[in-house]
Amino acid sequence: MIQPRHAILRGEPGNVALEVLLVPFYWKNEWVDTAIRLDGINLPSAHLADLAGKTFLFPLNPDAEAIDGSIYLDSAHHPCDVSVIEFMRSRNDGLKVLIKGVYVFEFEGLDQFGNTPFILSTTVSSCAV
């Protein structure tokens, strides 16, 4: 159901944000167009050239160094705990980002989905200049 479309990186060293735009999907009789927001990421840069080929590991909440992540679904922001972000070169001279984590759906009442592990991979661009 949740499939990435593209990711956008912005911010400054030590405080980077990553927005993962999702492919729209059908949920409870309506189309949903949403994104995963990851804020306060402790990365050395928001420039893709500086991140290419690197993997970053993160602690999970409630650790103070954890990424502040969420997905808006069913009228609520559901936490996303992210443990790994990897920046990989792609065949077309671009960059892809791989994100590993857990959707914490139980936090806002989507108990039927529980806490669901995920791995997402998509192209990434940056607003850094």
Give a label for each model feature:
Residues 57-125:
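Acidic, glycine-rich flexible loop segments
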